[in-house]
Regions:
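Leucine-rich tandem repeat or coiled-coil scaffolds
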Residues: 1-301
Length: 301
């Protein structure tokens, strides 16, 4: 499609009153095409979903879209994953979203927004009266420096149910900040914090927070070196606290001891239905112990 095709489409959308969903994923659209689409959004009142994933939209294009969203309150889903939004584009979106009342889902996976972009975006989202319920910031080079901004935003948010922070660099301090917010946030149902270089300390803080949280249903922690201490802490929490249904902890280095802890936990947990412990070197003994509770439950039916 390219920029020229996007311009033609944008001209049509300025007056169209029927189309509600636009999918422009992987269409080789750059800043010019994004600017044209942005202009159309300023007057269009029927589009509710705009997907422009995996294009070539840089700061200028994302900035133009941000300006449009300061005026448009019809679009509920904006997907810009796999572009070049960067910190400046994220900051522009954050500022625009303070004025926007319609957006409910924002997907910015893989845009290298970094700490500064994340901070500005969180500030904008926190200032909104009408909150979003789905936020994807995975693979964005977000480090522990952005942890306080994430914490402050999440602490006071009463609408977000899905948060994706997969493949960033939050590490222990960033994880601890997010964990702290879970003590107050009673809405998040899915948290993906996998691949963030989180160790035992971060896992322990997360386990502590989950004791006071009854909303989280799915937790993705895979590819974090939480080790045996982190695994044990989470297993102890899962045993009697929270309502986790799905827990994914593949390749977390919890070893046999961590496996034993989870084998004990699932005997008592009344909510856990899916437990992913792939790549944790559980060994035959660890796997055997995990199998025993399953067999026991079958006999009790």
């Amino acid at each position: 499609l390219g920029d020229e095709g996007a311009k033609v489409l944008a001209d049509y959308l300025k007056t169209d009153e029927k189309i509600t969903t636009i999918n422009l994923n992987a269409c080789s659209i750059g800043d010019e095409g994004a600017r044209a689409i942005a202009e159309a959004l300023k007057t269009n009142t029927t589009i509710t979903s705009l997907e422009m994933n995996n294009n070539m939209v840089d700061y200028e294009g994302s900035g133009a879209l941000a300006q449009a969203f300061a005026q448009n309150s019809t679009v509920e889903l904006l997907a810009l994953s796999g572009n070049y939004v960067g910190a400046l584009g994220a900051a522009a979106l954050g500022a625009a979203l303070k004025e926007n009342t319609g957006l409910r889902s924002l997907q910015l996976n893989g845009n290298d927004i970094g700490n500064e972009g994340c901070i500005k975006l969180c500030e904008g989202l926190a200032a909104r009266k009408d909150k979003i319920n789905n936020l994807d910031l995975g693979n964005n080079s977000i480090g522990p420096e952005a942890g306080p901004a994430l914490r402050d935003y999440l602490k006071n948010d009463d609408a977000l149910t899905h948060l994706n922070l997969y493949m960033n660099e939050l590490a222990n301090d960033g994880c601890a900040a997010v964990a702290e917010s879970l003590k107050d946030n009673k809405k998040i149902e899915l948290l993906d914090i996998g691949g963030n270089n989180i160790g035992a300390f971060g896992a322990e803080k997360l386990a502590e927070a989950l004791r006071d949280n009854d909303s989280l249903v799915t937790l993705e922690l895979g590819y974090n070196p939480i080790g045996v201490p982190g695994g044990k802490a989470l297993a102890e929490t899962v045993k009697f606290h929270g309502k986790l249904n799905t827990m994914r902890m593949g390749w977390c280095k919890i070893g046999k001891e961590g496996g034993f802890a989870f084998a004990d936990a699932i005997k008592y947990s009344s909510s856990l239905a899916v437990l992913d412990l792939r790549g944790n070197d559980l060994g035959d003994d660890g796997v055997a112990l995990l199998e025993k509770p399953k067999k026991k439950k079958k006999k009790e039916k």
